[in-house]
Amino acid sequence: MELLAVLAVPLSSAHYIRSHFPRKRGQLPLRQFPPQPMTITFIQYIIVCPLVFLAGFVDAIAGGGGLISLPAYMLAGLPVHKAIGTNKLSSAMGATLTTARFAKSGFIELRFAIPCSAAALLGSAIGARIALLIPEHVFKIIMLFVLPLVAAYVMSKKSLKDRSELEPFPFTKAIIIAVLCALFIGMYDGFYGPGTGTFLLLLLTGAARMPLNDSAGITKVINLSSNIAALAVYIFSGNVLYPLGLAAGVFSIAGNYLGTRVFTAKGSRGVKPIMITVLGIFFIKLRYELFFAK
């Protein structure tokens, strides 16, 4: 009887687990525990906030601020997925104000904006889900190769004037191309992000042959939509550090505001050396973590 009593405990426990947590054949067990909270230090604020301010400043002048803001979080020691998720929070804050400003100026055409926004929401959510499936060390290797290519392309981009002078497509053809661009670039933004605004502007003016002002407005709408969709995915996966992201968002808005005023007065001179310096520091740290740190 004593032996039966001892055996009954694990057997009854196993029955309880099977009855309350059924699992299909071939399905891996799901994690039942949420991610552990991460403590944010004062030093991390000191590293992230000024660099995100700088990213907003650069983005307003020449674009490509994401090439600085995402590395900023990783330089502060955040894991890759938390860095991307928290960066989406601060980016969404800045994108909201920028989009509102473009809408107020009349640069957002709703018949393009609404379908492109829907496509960006879908694409970004898919991209973010894919990103969460990739282990951190693999993601760092991807960044080691992708980020310099994106940086080189963004910093060497040519003037958009020639593209904007192309003969416009009929509305139906233009909107189909624009929606496809929003879907695939939205997927890239959810997965990774840096350079999204530049890619969109080049594709909308070149591939969809939209006027430059309309392309700029639709780019802001797509960027905001993809940020919101990716942010939602990262929030539900527990990969957003709210205090750091909100503080960085305020600095990003301030940097964007100052950058707009400086660009009006002096243009984009001096931006490339800033971006090269920040990216150089980030690559040194990334290579050390991948190849030398134990």
Question: Which residues does each PLM region occupy?
Answer:
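Membrane-interface alpha-helices at helix entry/exit sites of multi-pass transporters
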Residues: 80-86, 111, 210-220
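Residue-level signature of the transmembrane alpha-helical core
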Residues: 49, 53, 57, 88, ...
